[in-house]
Each structure stands twice: as C-alpha cells, then as structure tokens.
Amino acid sequence: MIKILKILIKLFLTFILLLSVYVVYLYIQNPVVVSRLGAVIMGETPGIAEVVESNYAYPINKATVKTISAESIQSAMEYSQATGSHALLIYHKEALVLEHYFPGYSKQHITSTASMHKSVLALLIGIAIDQGFIKSVDQSASDFLSEWANDQRSKITIRQMLQQSSGIDYPEFSFHPLGEWNEMVVGDNVLKITLNQAAEKEPDTEFAYNGINPQNLGLLLQRATGKRYSSYLSENLWQYVAEEDSYVILDSEINKMPRMFCCLDAIAKDWLRIGILLLNKGKLGDKQIVSESWVDEIISPSPLNPNYGFLTWLGTTHQENRIYNNKSTATAFHSEPFFDNDVIYFDGFGGQRVYIIPSKDLVIVRTGSIKMNWDDAKLPNIISQGAL
C-alpha cells in the first residue's frame, strides 16, 4: 500500500512539473494571452478598461400598484436565485416593479455581460445612419474597411454584417490557449484576427453568429464617424440614458481597440434603461435617441434566421436548442415556446439577458453567474403570465 501511495505521489508531482513546463512554454509564446486567461479564471477583467461617461440617468418610476402577481415574482426570484443571479429587475407598464440584488451584490455591481454589447452596437450603427455618417445598411462595408476593397469581401454590406450573414470566416471556439479564438477574446491585437478573416461563403447564404461581424462593424463605425468608439457611445447614447459610467475593454495600450463583440461592462439598471429605449421605439422622455424606423429594422426577422434581427435575438419561432452557428456545438436551451410572440432579447454568455416584450410593456434584466444550462423561456414566461 505504501509503495502504491509513493508511486501515485510521484505521478502527481510529475504531472504538476509537466503542466508547469507547458504553462511556461505557452507564456513564452504569448505572455499576454496566457496571463489574461489566468485573469479570466480568477474572475478579473482580461484587458484595459476605458470609461464610457454617463451624464444623465433616465428616471424610472417605482410601481405604486401591483401589475404582476406576487406568485410570478416569487417564482422568478426562486429561479434567479437557483441559477446564481446577481440582479433581477422587472419593468412593467412604465414602472419598476422589482429591483432585486442577491446577497453579495448591489446596485453598483458590474457583471460582465459579454455579447449583450452586440445589441448596443446595433443601436449605434442606426444613430450613425441617422446622422449621415453612413448612407444606409445596404452600403458596402468596404467603403469604410478598405482592407476588403479588392477581394471577395467587397461584396459584403453593412446589413449582412448586422444580420450575421456576411459569409466571413470566423474562428471556432477552442481550449487551445494560443488559438485564434483566444487571441480574439483576450489577445493584444484583436483586429489582427477579426479584420483579416477571409470570405468563406457568399453573403446571404448562411446565418453564422460570431464575433467577427460586430468587431468589424465597430471598426467601421469608428472610421465612419471619426470618433473613438467609447466617445461616440458616450456622446450619442450613454449620456442620455445611463446612471453610471460603463466600460469597454481595450485589447492593449498600444492598439487601444475596444472589443465591440463583447465586453461593455455596466450596472444592471442601465441595461434596463437600454431595454426601455427599445421598448419605446428609440425614445426616452422627449428625446428620440435613435429613429423609430431603425428600431423596427433591429427587431425585424432576418431572411436566414427569423429569430435574429440586427445583432439582436427574437422569439419568432420556437427552437428547443437554439443554434448559434454551424461550427459550434453550443446551443441555448428553451424549455418551451415563449408565451408572447414578440419577445426581443440581448443574449450574453451564460445567461446574461435583457428581455423586452412590447405587447406586455415589459422589460426584464438578469445578470449573474455563468449558467450553461440557462433556460431562455423560464423568466419571460413566468413573469409575462403573471402580468395583471
């Protein structure tokens, strides 16, 4: 028995030694990616935060009468708690019905909401069109992305990028620390990956949800407006909406390129305000921040995926396991059809969500721990069916 124990200890120590050597090797190959992956594991921000300034908090009145049943709110709270949520906010009939922060979290807490950022980018593209920086969604992306002008990518329009049907190639998710996917997500030169992807398919032949289209759209926006992304976001959206500053994450001090396919860090209540903006067709108070016609475009089903508009998900048809793209086995679980047929939602990795249901005058925000088995039908159905 002692001999077996000694052998097991030796094997364990050998494994630790080999693992350490491998980590050192990876670090030598790409210290930025490896150190930032370590930061992710430790729950830290994998990059440099750049402030998006707020200036004015759109006021949200608290509900003075019951408009959602106590049973529905209790069920929503129980599901949220069971899934490690940090915040649950419910807005119904022009009033805040619930603003709850779970133990260990507060109103000021910022949860990384990953791809929810994509839907904010869609709003900004519309604002840039309203302001005349971009002619229309059917303009060639290569008018701004000159790197695409002399190859097959010159066929790609802004609309196709917004609908994730551009045909551009994209890196597959990989656990390999030095693979393209990790380079894109935590590396120090995001455009080296995103701007250099080739056209894999003809535009408008396949829906493929990925980070390449939105990242290149963000670059396009910077070039079209002549402004840094964080400044344009602040001046045209955040300062009219938000209570607190938010943060975009830059790839490096040298390149200073925000990751626009993810990584807009903001408090839950400001995400609620963005949801209310869509609910109100681009208007908050007396100010039309983005045109109503643009919001209608955002929430119109795209030809290749009726459950997707412009960088925003829709509940048009039921899919029990919603597919993101054909390269990935990852899906989003829907235990049942949405109770309402007009659900609009921002989808952030692991259950970060803003649900908007115009027919019920309802917005729901959930931020929290990453849950790979998040049920997209649960919260909106529980709450909607309890609406009085």
Where are these regions (language model features)?
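Short, small/polar residue-rich loop motifs at catalytic or cofactor-binding pockets
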Residues: 82-85, 109, 349-351
